[in-house]
Amino acid sequence: MRLAFWLYEGTALHGLSRVTNSMKNVHTVYHAPQGDDYITATYTMLERTPEFPALSISVVRGQDLARGVSRLPGTLQQVEEHYHPEVIVVAPSCSTALLQEDLSQLSMHSGVDTGKILVHDVNPFRVQEHESAEGLFTGLVKRYALEQSTTEKPSVNLLGFTSLGFHLRSDLISLRRILKTLGVEVNVVAPWGAGIEDLRNLPAGWVNVVPYHEMGPGAAHHLREKFGMPSLQGIPMGVNPTLDWIRDLLELLNVIAAEKGLPSIEMPPLTDFSLDGLSAPSGVPWFARTADMESFSGKRAFVFGDATHTVGMVKFLKDELGMQIIGAGTYLEQHADWIRDQLEGYLPVPLMVTDKFQEVAKKIEDEMPELVCGTQMERHSCRKLDVPCMVISTPTHIENHLIGYYPILGFDGADILADRVYTSCKLGLEKHLIDFFGDAGLEYEEEEPESISNGHAAAAGSEGGVPDSGEAGDAGDTDGMPWSPDAEKMLRKVPFFVRKKVRKNTENFARENGEATITAEVFKRAKEALGG
């Protein structure tokens, strides 16, 4: 029944397609019913690249099952003839996994070179998107990486960048800029844009850089165990974490440089990392000290997402913007322990671990923070509650797959994050000013009701009768106490993004003090008692 609702993670099929669709000359064949070709549409809608997804469906039909035949061998032949890929990844869907067919045996009857075929026979009922993607990428690295001498100049591999990643291409540009400033070459980026030859050349790099905890650690572990390659797995999200990341990278590179008898790589002036080469690499340190941003020190924030962006965002909000973290959570249970370890001392309450968006929405409604950093699901939930929300993690909508340069990592990413936090919290004030001065010729508020309202009268526009979204979220609450017109007028002067919370607290105060109706006097007393 949960498939009728939003899910945070996609299927195993979606996960492995994120890897194969990232790579060159790699084609994926799904042994699946016709409906599972939705994945192709997902990439054409969201990825915003000129290439068509290298995905094909070996359609399973009831007729074929009755006859005891399979279309898989024929599909593999067609893919080989039309696309000539270096590797064909074959995988079952949830439906075809129930058939328990031997896909390896079926593939052998296709006539295609078996060395080109990789059967990724993952259990789609036990494995979801991230684990499937990580497993396939690690398997490809194990299969193709070859022993070879390292590059003459300092170089790194950037691992974990995949199709449909969160602001992936911008993050890649941001890290490339930093590496170029340091004089460090990029040996291979994988899986994004990599071919099989690139995977073979991975051991030529000096260090493996893995900025995402969900994708790449398995491959880096294998390269370390088999080829002795060191890896850097910090998250350069924010100004100070980026500086720490650069120092850690230089330390790893200089150890290898010393072994090769090469000079050490020195830390360049910070201005070299800026876009103009003259100013500070990020405006966050001074921006956080402005009067406008210092008001954020009292604001409460809740963060929910994948492992990487939850950890990075909590530290950014707390350490660099001075916001109060009231809680954090993730939908990736397998990474929960790592998140707890990374955020030790940051969270006042235990980490929330759930893949049910309703539980996250309830948490937000109970706490009513001034800012939520979450996924597309939290954006929808917060819209109903009039709580400011910024998306910092997958799953996302199309507005988070942008053509422009919007990194999350590095110095440039720190500026983007600060801007997003500021605008998410501040843009709602425009609507609040219309609420506040609505009777000053703006014709935003309707005339005050003559009789006592039920506590949920919504303001309407002068023409369309559109309810004020600040009150719309309360319209379905049948347990509200009656409010007098004067009290309603005072309530509308409260900013819309905390209005629901103020209404709830005031009604609780009135009940505790035996008041039957909330008047202006009761509202004032509640405000004084609750510290407002």
UniProtKB/Swiss-Prot annotation:
The active site is at D292 (proton donor). Binds 1 [4Fe-4S] cluster per heterodimer. The cluster is bound at the heterodimer interface by residues from both subunits. One of its GO terms (molecular function) is oxidoreductase activity, acting on the CH-CH group of donors, iron-sulfur protein as acceptor. The keyword Cytoplasm does not apply. Pathway: Porphyrin-containing compound metabolism; bacteriochlorophyll biosynthesis (light-independent). Pfam families: Oxidored_nitro (PF00148), PCP_red (PF08369). SUPFAM superfamilies: Helical backbone' metal receptor. Residues 445-486 are annotated as: Disordered. [4Fe-4S] cluster binds at D36. InterPro entries: ChlB/BchB/BchZ, LI-POR_suB-like_C, Nase/OxRdtase_comp1, P-CP_red_C, Protochl_reductB, Protochlorophyllide_Rdtase. Its EC number is 1.3.7.7. Keywords: 4Fe-4S, ATP-binding, Bacteriochlorophyll biosynthesis, Chlorophyll biosynthesis, Iron, Iron-sulfur, Metal-binding, Nucleotide-binding, Oxidoreductase, Photosynthesis. It catalyses: chlorophyllide a + oxidized 2[4Fe-4S]-[ferredoxin] + 2 ADP + 2 phosphate = protochlorophyllide a + reduced 2[4Fe-4S]-[ferredoxin] + 2 ATP + 2 H2O. Component of the dark-operative protochlorophyllide reductase (DPOR) that uses Mg-ATP and reduced ferredoxin to reduce ring D of protochlorophyllide (Pchlide) to form chlorophyllide a (Chlide). This reaction is light-independent. The NB-protein (BchN-BchB) is the catalytic component of the complex. PANTHER family: LIGHT-INDEPENDENT PROTOCHLOROPHYLLIDE REDUCTASE SUBUNIT B. This is Light-independent protochlorophyllide reductase subunit B. It comes from Chlorobium phaeobacteroides (strain BS1). The lineage of its organism: Bacteria, Pseudomonadati, Chlorobiota, Chlorobiia, Chlorobiales.
